[in-house]
Curated annotation (Swiss-Prot):
It comes from Sinorhizobium fredii (strain NBRC 101917 / NGR234). This is Type 3 secretion system ATPase. It catalyses: ATP + H2O + cellular proteinSide 1 = ADP + phosphate + cellular proteinSide 2. ATP binds at residues 184-189. Signal peptide: none annotated. The keyword Cell membrane does not apply. It holds the Pfam family ATP-synt_ab_N. The keyword rRNA processing does not apply. Belongs to the ATPase alpha/beta chains family. T3SS ATPase subfamily. The gene is sctN. Keywords: ATP-binding, Cytoplasm, Nucleotide-binding, Plasmid, Protein transport, Translocase, Transport, Virulence.
Amino acid sequence: MITPVPQHNSLEGTPLEPAISSLWSTAKRIDTRVVRGRITRAVGTLIHAVLPEARIGELCLLQDTRTGLSLEAEVIGLLDNGVLLTPIGGLAGLSSRAEVVSTGRMREVPIGPDLLGRVIDSRCRPLDGKGEVKTTEVRPLHGRAPNPMTRRMVERPFPLGVRALDGLLTCGEGQRIGIYGEPGGGKSTLISQIVKGAAADVVIVALIGERGREVREFVERHLGEEGLRRAIVVVETSDRSATERAQCAPMATALAEYFREQGLRVALLLDSLTRFCRAMREIGLAAGEPPTRRGFPPSVFAALPGLLERAGLGERGSITAFYTVLVEGDGTGDPIAEESRGILDGHIVLSRALAARSHFPAIDVLQSRSRVMDAVVSETHRKAASFFRDLLARYAECEFLINVGEYKQGGDPLTDRAVASIGELKEFLRQSEDEVSDFEETVGWMSRLTS
């Protein structure tokens, strides 16, 4: 009788054994099958396809072997007899012969420190002619917001170099604030000032649905070579597909999260939140969602908090975020303006009337508010800002009488002081685009005006 020779594992009992066992266990779970499907319908910005085992958010390739066409698409819905895909890009050249190939991957963002100083699109492709973009890792496009119980509280001011903001609407490090204004209300001017003056280590700018002319103008004139060194600009112009425009905002946020995890102070400027929501509306309506307020489907209002809550303070670094919102008039009835105000930590309201009088930045101080200001400024600063606002309010109440020559001095001492000092108050609030004001000097000037 022959006795079997026992198999001896040469790694047994060595330090490598646990690692090898873990790798072997993982390898056995890997599915190496390539799942393929076919297109059944393609209309507008939506593709119907048969694709077994597809998941919401999964990336697929649309491939036509005869023409060599290869397009990326994302699964956005599941049907009884197939899936809904939205292409990342246009549908030009797509035919009924194209195969749908599952990649098994969700949307990811290539990231690395070498992205600083670059202008890229939402898929990390270079737009600045500086060659290939070098990245070191990837992370999910749709990250999770920090745990509310581990998120640090906003306790320090975040100087912006803009007197009206630093003095009267002081922002805190890690705050999220909306900038609300009509077209032509001075949003670009204010964004330019914030980019230049923000006390940040890294600046991330997302330009969503902008005109192509304005993108180059912003990068070269407003940001400049010096500002671009610490910045990354993510661009999807108005001619790009809804999927690309919708991807721009979470892409910029993912970049900001990467630098926050390095312990850095990040300023995130997203222009505009309205155009992001419009792109989401295009996708949602094409997928058959019911229109609700102003034609926006429910998925838009679900996506907003998921995007906005990702900014703020982390365990180490911070993302101080500014989101522009396009409104008509005072924004009453605008669902995006109303929804975002309920989520964000403050709002800056821009006045077209001030912009028409060449009063820049065109901030309507009395209609604006920073919800964290009291937590990040001294009592002296808070009192000076409160009195400054009182003077502006008193002048606003009697401005009509002054203009028609009916105002009479002596009725109220505070109103008389407001009228006498309005020139100095406006001088404080006005600031040229290239001027960056020191935070302490701003507070000192405001204190002298209100003493």
